[in-house]
């Protein structure tokens, strides 16, 4: 039977499959046509993400059904030097004990008028 796979760019791919084919097989056919690795593919049908081990029949996918292909988003790890820079920028601050203003690390007095430019400052608490 013939099914259609619609990509995010709007391109429609036609695939020749059997209802007993697994989702993994369909992803392999998409890789052959488009060059997208199966581990980066997510197939959606009727609002549900299709799992690799299941077959097309399990999802009631019939001839001329349209699947939607979405690329998997990879979570990122921040490079250690950038992570240290972000931590320095966000955590190394002084806090006013009266008005809780965040101040630069070498501050001696608060910059706000509301607390009378007090010199009662403390270091910002570190995240755990």
From Swiss-Prot:
Residues 1-76 form the Ubiquitin-like domain. GO terms for cellular component: cytoplasm; nucleus; ribonucleoprotein complex; ribosome. Keywords: Cytoplasm, Isopeptide bond, Nucleus, Ribonucleoprotein, Ribosomal protein, Ubl conjugation. This is Ubiquitin-ribosomal protein eL40y fusion protein. There is a cross-link at residue 76 (Glycyl lysine isopeptide (Gly-Lys) (interchain with K-? in acceptor proteins)). Pfam families: Ribosomal_L40e, ubiquitin. PROSITE patterns: UBIQUITIN_1, UBIQUITIN_2.
């Amino acid at each position: 039977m013939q099914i259609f796979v619609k990509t995010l760019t709007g391109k429609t791919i036609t695939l020749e499959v059997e209802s007993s084919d697994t989702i993994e097989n369909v992803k392999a056919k998409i890789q052959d046509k488009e060059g997208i690795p199966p581990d980066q593919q997510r197939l959606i049908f009727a609002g549900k993400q299709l799992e690799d081990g299941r077959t097309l029949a399990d999802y009631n996918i019939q001839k001329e059904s349209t699947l939607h292909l979405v690329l998997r988003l990879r979570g990122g790890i921040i490079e250690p030097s950038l992570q240290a820079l972000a931590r320095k920028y966000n955590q190394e601050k002084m806090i006013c004990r009266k008005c809780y203003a965040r101040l630069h690390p070498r501050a001696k007095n608060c910059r706000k008028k509301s607390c009378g430019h007090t010199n009662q400052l403390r270091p910002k608490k570190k995240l755990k």
